[in-house]
Amino acid sequence: MEGWEEVSILAAILYSFPASKDPVTSLLFDSVHNLLWCGDSSGSARSFTPNAGYPFQLYPYTKFPATTSPLPVVQQRNHSRGILSLSQNCVNLNSRRGLSQATFTAASVTDSANVLRNLSCMTTLGTGNDIIVGGTHSLGSLDMQKCVATGFDHSGNLSFVDSVAKTLVLGTTDGTVELFDTASNSSVKSFPAHSGLLSDMAVQGNYIATCGYSARRRYDHKNSSAAGGTSYITDPLVHLIDTRMMKSLSPIPFPNGASFVRFHPKLPNIVIVASSTGVLEFVDIFDQSKLNVYQVNMSPASPGISRMEISDNGEYICCSEGRSLHLWSFTSDTNFVNFPAPLEEQDIPAPLPPPFEVDDPVPLSSVGMPYYKDYLLSNYATDMVFTKELSKVPAEVDTSLGHGAFVPYDRTAHGPRNISQPYQSLREPPGSNSNAPRFISERDGESNENMIHAENSIFHLKSPTSVPHCYSRLQIQYSKFGVDDFDFDYYNKSNGACSGLENHLDNSYTNALLQLYRAAPAFYNSVVESLLPEYLPNGPEIISWNPQGSSLLIELGYLFDMMHKAEGRNVKIANFSQLLTQSASAASAGVINTDEEKSLNADGLREIIIRFNHYLLSELTSNQRERRHTNSEKIEDIMGIKLEMQIKSQCTETETHTGSQLIFDLTSPPEQYLNKLAMLRRAEKTEITILSYMDYFMDQYKSASCRECEARGRPHAVNARQRVVRLPKVLSINLSMTNFELQQIHNCRGWLVPEFHIGEDERFVDAGRGRKYELLGYVCEISHGPGVKRGAHNLVSFVKIKGQWYLFNDFLVMPIAQEEALNLSYSWKKPVIIVYSEPGQDFSYFETSTFKKIQDLDTSIIYRDHFVRAAREGHRQEYKLLTKQEAPEIGTLIAIDAEFVVSEPEQLEIRYTGTRKLIKPKKLTLARVSVLRGNGPNIGVPFIDDYIVWTGHIEDYLTSFSGIEPGDLDPEVSKKALVTLQTVYRKLWLLLNMGCVFVGHGLQNDFRCINLVVPKTQVRDTADLFYLPEFKRKLSLKFLAYVLLKEKVQTGNHDSVEDAYTALMLFQKHEELTRTGDLETVLYQVYMEGQQRRFRAP
């Protein structure tokens, strides 16, 4: 096999979002056409074809989504009808033009064995209508004609699957190769190929070749003892198996570490072996001294070879490296197959006839009209136009009605029967609150009667047939004054005890769950205390996939602390949501929503919040393990449920396994168990509650036959018992139930118990004995109409805080009676996540008086720089860092100003009348922060002047207002010394908790965009200090500086240092006028002069 060389390098994927280390996840040469296929990590399939006139040049042919969700394409296969694509939970069949032919998921086929879940490999068998799929604990067959998935009797995780005649070849994750007979539904033979994992497997004729990893124990050489861990190294041998003789052959040595292996399709005695470092070797399996070695030309920063495939004619080899494809060949022929079929080209539309030009000199009457006798429709008389009132659309049939043979009339859902309902016009749909005050600027024009009527209608809880207004989806309205004019305080009735969360951001469906965990003292303390030690990663690899330089644990800690400091004011989850949206792990977990739940129906909304609950606790636990040790209690200790499994068998000794999980996934018990509870309920007059459900799942018995002894003719049972041995301080319960199962809960009065007690054996006991658990709250889904309707439903939470129950519906917060909170009889009220906790736990809030004395607190970042990369050559530092002698104290004055850029434009609705309505405001991203000393010998000298790195899209730099030029925030080309958002946020957060007083102009907008909540006692805003309410106009910084300081500022591009210094001087002017008693007189003179100059500085 001489003469091979690299003939082409193709950039298959130019950009991937979210960023992935392995964008190309599958490779395939077409068996019919001259096409090279690849799948990527976002679920798209691409094909490339060579041009006959330009050899070795590949051109894009098609690109289309090959999966139902943005999950990686695991594998691709040729099919007579197109290309098969495999993802984690589905199999797609697309034509080579990209048209979808069929999609097979667990929901679309009859899949009683859960075959189509957690898939990792597939192959075809027989005629091609049967697809063999394998994955985690599953091996099955998918009939494409009947849409039926059948499971095989096989256990173990599979990495590869192929076929030899009618026998399947299985490659497992533990390095074993199995021959599986589908006719007898059993394994024929097993070969231990590698002691570690399998990295690749190839089958040709009667031979099987594998490569993989070897497991090695780690040793502590200093103490000459095992360290207790296992590491994996690439195996330097290619394992060969002969299926005719049913034995292993002599392995092929490959010192560079074999990662990929393929048989030559035309020369079955030739094996192609490749390493991740790009070494290619052609070797004869019968004469291993005959070999040819080549090296792939890889880039210096290459992640390594990730895939290798060979064409059907054996003349081309393709290797994937990151986003690039390397094409190798030894011939000038451009065909991947011997007799390629012609490709289907796009249709070319026929040319349109030349247009008839009608301009000012040519009248429209010159076009001509056919002869007619009757009046034209345009001559319709105006008195014959009638407007008919819109009729009421009939309600859709509930899809859950088909689950039972007989469904009685639901009085709670539809009200009493045989009572006429008042007509409701579609022009004024129910739930619209025209009397509710939306804008602060409208307060003066409202009467007290309208205010009382609106309050009664919005916060009224009783509604006989419909959902009360307080549970409806809330929308933030925007006036000409922006979001600051929206009256958030009107919707908060907690008297400052709780803060609502805004819902016009991505992933706002998490608001209900965040409010619930915020009320758990142990959970709150563990998360917030993680902010004390410093965590500021800023390496290049961090910036590429995490430009904020933060973690979910850190952002949640900041969010909880801001919710405490808000004291009833609304809070944004902007930084938390942005980190979640940019996270690759969140995308793979399916917990990202960027359309404000408009694409989710009722089931989808419940599923995504349950998935997020799993993802949140798992990610927080992982983040805490990565951080250095602190004295705070860990999430896994607070919420970890201790489990024990005992396996008893006659042939082996009793085995005991222990483990833990963070969430109790509660489903509906079997029907026979519920029938038993119903009989006990009638006999003993006891209610069916959540404890009845939990009691079934906390101690379960299962049995199965011993396969080994059954094969020897001595069948017996193996009994397994799984039970909960310890419940945590905070118990989180997911209710993964269908609508039909939730209806059973609605019929159980008192299903949600306010408290329960656990004995020493972790079983429920009577009150007064054992450990006590109280209901902290729960998240429920509110259904507005049919469950299949998308974007109509929302999530709320009921939380008990200091003995009082509160309803949290995004930014609506109101107290509620315990009877109403625990009432689950409404058909539209469906619980999703329930949290119980042990009482007697206290919150550890950060107070300014004791903040600096907290153990493990690291404040070093405010005394040093922490750039993303080293300072650029020629960079001039125009600020002076704080020293330990200047350490901030309570009441220390600091002047601050921030600049922003627009990352997303505003969304407008333009009506036919020409009026414009703001649907969603533009999204601002922090670009620069400057902080100056406000007192002391160095007053006015900046000690923070940071530019924040931003790798995303920038819609508008706002250069004339922000002073930010294109490229200033790009770490690759910027001449500024950049820092991460997490770095500058920690500096401001430390200054806030140390008790510093912030001086600035228009700080409300700056703090809102930074997502920083500062108590009013620590804010000195010159826009409010120099403001007279009767004029209803706030003065600009530029105008105040011209009138009061006699200085001209902002003459060019804005400079945040200059603006902060000007605000500091205005504050000193205000203090001076206040001491002399001339403030009101001077302020009136300023407004008078402003009216003469139209409030503009020359």
Curated annotation (Swiss-Prot):
SUPFAM superfamilies given in the database record: Cysteine proteinases, Ribonuclease H-like, WD40 repeat-like
Annotated binding of a divalent metal cation, by residue: 897, 899, 1006, 1059
InterPro entries per UniProt: Exonuclease_RNaseT/DNA_pol3, PAN2, PAN2-PAN3_catalytic_subunit, PAN2_N, PAN2_UCH_dom, Papain-like_cys_pep_sf, RNaseH-like_sf, RNaseH_sf
Cofactor binding: number and manner: Binds 2 metal cations per subunit in the catalytic exonuclease domain.
Primary residence: cytoplasm
GO BP annotations, alphabetical order: mRNA processing; nuclear-transcribed mRNA poly(A) tail shortening
Chain intervals for the UniProt region annotation (Linker): 340-466
Cofactor(s) essential for the protein: a divalent metal cation
Exonuclease domain: residues covered: 894-1067
Protein name, UniProt field: PAN2-PAN3 deadenylation complex catalytic subunit PAN2
Gene it is expressed from: PAN2
